[in-house]
């Protein structure tokens, strides 16, 4: 009987036909995650600290024992592709667990993972309310946005990505936004397009590319090889997911120094510490977009939420009177079981009825 989460190991032996040869695979050293050189790699990932006030407030709340929710939205890497098992070895879960470890037993820290393989920020900005906010029942304190390798087909050239970022920044509870730039095995990502968005809003930015790619080509300083980092040409191995989590952890460590100082100066009074950190409101009117903000107020309408909206709808669905149940499914949060995407849809009835 098949059981979710159970894995087996197999040995695969490849043979070459006569007359063919293959280069000998060099022996790889164990990854020294505790070395000073590894620490320098992680430091290189912090391409911009920006204005960390929102993040400081979230860390202060966590240190004070208040409930704090950390959310992740992105593509297949955020979903956990390459990680085995996908729900507990992915970078998002590893980051969450490290975050819990920074703040006592972590019972006050909550986790949302909303990665969908093969999807860009064009879809991310539409599903944010459902997959991250859970139809406005959740207010995350920190949102990590990871679309640096998914947006190549974005016809708006950054407008969708920036619209998603602005949508999060405009949230009433003022969550911290962290931009995370993952990388493919050919060293490709779109961070040169996306960095200006982060600089425009003074956001913390973490580049996995800056962390791992330079050392791939420096034999004297190499800590992890491409073969060790990548599961395939797109996704990280368990070790690669750990590197990504450690990059984010390095950011949190640096900002936590400020958070601890704010709490100490306030004598442990959380309210006073938050007040001292300063205003973090997002002024939508004065914050000019870098690429554009055409979609910052876009909303998802489907069979579930359409009837609840304070709008009078009068239209004929025509042939779209069925529901499609053959949907892409993903592992949300800590689940090993999958959840269908966009289940409350309209499907065309080809019979014409």
Predicted features, each with a name:
Residues 5, 15-19, 63-66, 90-110, ...:
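Alpha-helical cap/lid subdomain in secreted, periplasmic
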Residues 1-73, 78-86, 104-108, 138, ...:
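N-terminal secretory targeting modules
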């Amino acid at each position: 009987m098949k059981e979710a989460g159970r894995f087996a190991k197999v040995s695969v032996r490849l043979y070459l036909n006569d007359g063919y040869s293959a280069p000998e695979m060099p022996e790889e050293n164990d990854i020294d995650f505790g070395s000073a050189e590894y620490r320098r790699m992680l430091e290189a990932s912090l391409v911009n600290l920006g204005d960390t006030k929102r993040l400081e407030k979230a860390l202060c709340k966590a240190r004070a024992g208040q409930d704090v929710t950390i959310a992740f939205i992105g593509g297949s890497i955020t979903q956990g592709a390459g990680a085995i098992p996908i729900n507990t070895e992915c970078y998002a879960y590893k980051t969450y667990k490290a975050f819990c470890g920074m703040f006592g037993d972590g019972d006050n820290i909550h986790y949302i993972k909303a990665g969908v393989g093969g999807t860009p920020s064009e879809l991310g900005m539409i599903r944010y309310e459902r997959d991250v906010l859970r139809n406005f029942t959740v207010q995350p304190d920190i949102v990590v946005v990871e679309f640096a390798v998914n947006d190549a087909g974005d016809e708006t050239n950054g407008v969708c990505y920036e619209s998603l970022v602005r949508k999060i920044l405009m949230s009433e509870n003022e969550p911290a936004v962290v931009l995370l730039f993952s990388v493919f095995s050919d060293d490709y990502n779109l961070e040169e397009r996306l960095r200006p968005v982060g600089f425009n809003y003074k956001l913390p930015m973490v580049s996995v590319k800056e962390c791992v790619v330079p050392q791939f080509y420096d034999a004297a300083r190499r800590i992890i090889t491409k073969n060790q980092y990548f599961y395939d040409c797109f996704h990280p191995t368990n070790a690669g997911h750990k590197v990504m989590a450690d990059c984010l952890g390095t950011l949190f460590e640096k900002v936590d120094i400020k958070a601890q100082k704010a709490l100490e100066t306030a004598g442990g009074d959380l309210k006073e510490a938050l007040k001292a950190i300063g205003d973090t409101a997002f002024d939508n009117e004065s914050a000019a977009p870098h690429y554009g903000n055409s979609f910052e107020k876009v909303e998802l309408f489907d069979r579930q939420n359409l009837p609840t909206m304070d709008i009078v709808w009068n239209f004929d669905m025509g042939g779209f009177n069925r529901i499609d149940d053959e949907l892409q499914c993903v592992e949300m949060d800590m689940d090993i079981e999958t959840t269908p995407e966009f289940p409350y849809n309209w499907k065309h009835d080809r019979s014409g009825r």
